[in-house]
């Protein structure tokens, strides 16, 4: 539809310039219409007229005007006669416009891209001629031209619109051409399929189309053919023929046999290429047997032999693999000493070790059997003392005998971990295993109080094996905070050595460096690096003095983000004052409230968000050093609980951590914030684990308790007594804890839960 509309528009805009050009061409001397008029002289395309049209020249192509009249025009050159002859282009343009309209009209009925392109070319030429005629009029008659000369400009515009319409029609024709081409292709495919069904008769009859078909070649012949190209031989291959990567054949001294992957029935034809004639439908209906066994079917009847069916549980009957040669009787005890293992499975055996199918099967032994060959004599160098027959011993010895025998090893591998016991087999002494001592089971070379490898994976209490001081020091470094590393025993038993080794194993999962020196001060100086710091192992002490290590301790212990906080001064009081702000505090880096030692020690425990064990028992240096190494880095040890609320050094320093406010501490405890690197082991009351939330609420005090306890920090009635809290935590009392969440560990409305 759109193509026809565009065609009619093109015809319309081609007829308009035809009419305009005809109007411009009909002028004096034929009519009274003029292109220009100067001093009573009228100019047209074919001549001039004077005296109001009474005196006119003859009609001709080109004319000369008088010299007096030429001076009134812009162009006064000698070429005016030539240009006047070119005015004939008006008539030519009008004719081409009308001819183009006729072509476009006929193209409506003939939808062809080539015809449309020809129309575009003709209209374009017409437009060029019209432009030329309008230009000559302007050159000859300016400034005295009349309105009749400007109608040519309208013809030019109309021709351009016609060209645009024809271009749009060309695009539409190209699209319909592509669509018709696709439809034609589909029609061609459909017609081809229809003609095929017409030519072929359905249903196909065996006697019409498939009266005889060649059979497929034997599979094993195709694999073991002697020629790489061309048909293989009819007869079976023999030993010495060329083998290819796909062959399944093994030279064993006898005639080679090939295991065919065909599982049950194999048809052997007299000739591979002999066609086997298939019966037609009528013969198949009349016969009582299958067509392959009918007497009227084949010229050479195939010989069919039955083979054993494929059984995966039977060793050796796997498709594509030969049968196995395995002695079904186990070797006796008397023949074990004179047994030699065949350690070369790819070496050719003797002719006697052939299976019933004639195939060597050493490489395809899939059962847990041992194929042994009896030899008349065994040389001593061929049978090492430690090479005992592993499978044979297990085959003949009972479970009681195996528990009392030596450890059985693989051939050629000496056993250094075998027990020293007697053998139940009557064999010469030369063939017995060497008696060795096991470093795992022999405890004579180590102290009896030392933790043994393999027994320390679940002991995380840090309790010593024996009550001696050295032994507890030896055991403590291995059990405090070590989840996986259980093999790092002390270098030796002295007390200094355990202190030197303590910094490497206590609470350090990854950094296992040794001490910098043997003195106790050096181990104390290094202790701040490794205790409780999994990844940071570079902040050594400034010097070996005890004061300096205490000054640096607050900056390096447990601080992941802030690793550059040096001590503010060398005095002991200053390091104690700053210790509470930096030791074990990932986010809260507040300074001390005053310079007194008691205040800084008291607030040290209160400003550690979740670490309830790193606080010193009292303000003395020795006690803090004693408690610090045991409690830092132990995940589940909350031994920092106060023992008595009346003791100044012990309870007063620790009570701020457990909810007992101090007299000189008027600042309200705040809810702690956590950084990305130090996440506590359990959250607050909104914990996902209700037991952790309950325990936290029970002994956390005002810093972690309910909102009612945090409203008035000075009101001691809101704080549970320490003795009751200790009784509840030790299991001597029943209490209810506000726990947020239900039994499925989901966040929800809080409630009380009885805990015994």
From Swiss-Prot:
Region annotation Disordered: where it falls in the sequence: 281-328, 427-453, 482-650, 686-713, 735-756
Annotated compartments: Cell membrane; Cell tip
Residue ranges, compositional bias (Low complexity): 289-300, 485-520
Biological process, per Gene Ontology: cell division; exocytosis
Lineage: superkingdom: Eukaryota
Modified positions (Phosphoserine) in chain numbering: 438
InterPro entries hit by this protein: pH-response_reg_palI/RIM9 (IPR051380), SUR7/Rim9-like_fungi (IPR009571)
Hydrolase among keywords: no
Entry's transmembrane regions: 91-111, 120-140, 148-168
Sugar-bearing residue positions: 52, 64, 190, 396, 407, 459, 470-471, 496-497, 521-522, 547-548, 573-574, 594, 598-599, 618, 623, 649, 664, 676, 685, 715
UniProt-recorded name of the protein: Membrane-anchored protein 1
Organism for this UniProt entry: Schizosaccharomyces pombe (strain 972 / ATCC 24843)
Source organism phylogeny: Eukaryota, Fungi, Dikarya, Ascomycota, Taphrinomycotina
């Amino acid at each position: 539809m759109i193509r026809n509309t565009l065609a009619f528009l093109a015809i319309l805009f081609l007829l308009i310039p035809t009419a305009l050009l005809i109007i411009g061409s009909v002028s004096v001397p034929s009519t009274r219409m003029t292109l220009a008029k100067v001093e009573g002289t009228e100019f047209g395309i074919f001549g001039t007229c004077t005296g109001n049209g009474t005196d006119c020249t003859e009609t001709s192509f080109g004319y000369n005007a008088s010299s007096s009249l030429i001076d009134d025009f812009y162009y006064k050159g000698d070429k005016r006669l030539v240009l006047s002859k070119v005015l004939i282009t008006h008539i030519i343009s009008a004719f081409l416009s009308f001819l183009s309209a006729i072509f476009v009209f006929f193209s409506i009925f003939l939808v062809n891209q080539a015809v449309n392109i020809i129309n575009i070319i003709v209209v374009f030429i017409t437009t060029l001629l019209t432009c030329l005629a309008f230009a000559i009029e302007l050159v000859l008659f300016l400034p005295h031209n009349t309105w009749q000369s400007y109608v040519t400009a309208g013809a030019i515009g109309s021709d351009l619109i016609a060209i645009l319409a024809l271009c749009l029609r060309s695009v539409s024709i190209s699209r319909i051409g592509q669509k018709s081409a696709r439809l034609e292709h589909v029609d061609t495919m459909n017609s081809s399929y229809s003609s095929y069904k017409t030519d072929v008769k359905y249903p196909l009859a065996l006697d019409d189309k498939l009266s005889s078909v060649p059979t497929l070649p034997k599979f094993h012949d195709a694999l073991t053919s002697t020629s790489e190209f061309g048909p293989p031989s009819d007869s079976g291959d023999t030993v010495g023929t060329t083998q290819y990567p796909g062959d399944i054949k093994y030279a064993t001294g006898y005639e080679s046999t090939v295991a065919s992957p065909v599982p049950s029935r194999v048809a052997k034809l007299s000739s591979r290429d002999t066609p086997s004639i298939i019966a037609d439908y009528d013969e198949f209906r009349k016969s009582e047997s299958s067509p392959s066994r009918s007497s009227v079917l084949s010229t050479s009847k195939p010989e069919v032999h039955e083979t054993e069916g494929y059984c995966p549980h039977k060793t050796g009957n796997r498709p594509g693999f030969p049968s196995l040669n395995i002695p079904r009787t186990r070797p006796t005890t008397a023949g074990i000493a004179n047994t030699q293992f065949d350690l070369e499975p790819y070496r050719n055996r003797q002719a006697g070790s052939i299976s019933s199918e004639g195939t060597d099967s050493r490489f395809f032994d899939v059962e847990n059997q041992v194929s042994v060959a009896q030899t008349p004599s065994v040389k001593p160098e061929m049978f090492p003392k430690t090479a005992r027959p592993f499978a044979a011993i297990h085959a003949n010895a009972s479970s009681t005998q195996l528990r009392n025998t030596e450890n059985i090893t693989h051939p050629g591998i000496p056993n250094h971990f075998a027990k020293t016991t007697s053998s139940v087999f009557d064999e010469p002494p030369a063939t017995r295993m060497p008696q060795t001592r096991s470093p795992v089971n022999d405890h004579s070379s180590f102290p009896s109080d030392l933790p043994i490898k393999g027994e320390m994976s679940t002991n995380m209490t840090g309790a010593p094996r024996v009550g001696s001081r050295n032994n507890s020091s030896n055991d403590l470094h291995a059990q405090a905070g070590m989840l996986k590393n259980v093999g790092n025993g002390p270098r030796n038993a002295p007390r200094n050595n355990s202190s030197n080794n303590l910094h490497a194993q206590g609470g350090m999962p990854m950094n296992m460096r040794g001490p910098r020196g043997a003195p106790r001060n050096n181990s104390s100086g290094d202790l701040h690096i490794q205790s409780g710091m999994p990844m940071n192992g570079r902040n050594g002490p400034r010097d070996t003095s005890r004061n300096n290590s205490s000054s640096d301790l607050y900056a390096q212990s447990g601080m992941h983000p802030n690793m550059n906080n040096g001590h503010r001064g060398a005095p002991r009081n200053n390091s104690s004052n700053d210790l509470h702000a930096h030791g074990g505090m990932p986010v809260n880096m507040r300074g001390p409230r005053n310079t007194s030692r008691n205040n800084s020690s008291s607030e040290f425990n209160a400003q550690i968000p979740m670490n309830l064990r790193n606080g010193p028992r009292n303000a003395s240096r020795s006690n803090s050093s004693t408690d610090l190494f045991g409690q830092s880095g132990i995940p589940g040890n909350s031994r920092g609980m106060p023992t008595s609320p009346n003791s100044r050094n012990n309870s007063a320093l620790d009570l701020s951590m457990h909810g007992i406010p101090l007299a000189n501490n008027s600042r309200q405890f705040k809810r702690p914030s956590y950084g990305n690197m130090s996440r506590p082991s359990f959250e607050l009351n909104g914990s996902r684990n209700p037991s952790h939330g309950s325990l936290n609420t029970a002994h956390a005090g005002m810093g972690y308790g309910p909102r009612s306890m945090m409203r008035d920090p000075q009101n001691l009635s809101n704080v549970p007594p320490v003795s009751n809290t200790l009784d509840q935590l030790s299991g001597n009392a029943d209490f209810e804890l506000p726990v947020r969440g239900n039994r499925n560990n989901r966040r929800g409305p809080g409630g009380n839960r009885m805990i015994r």
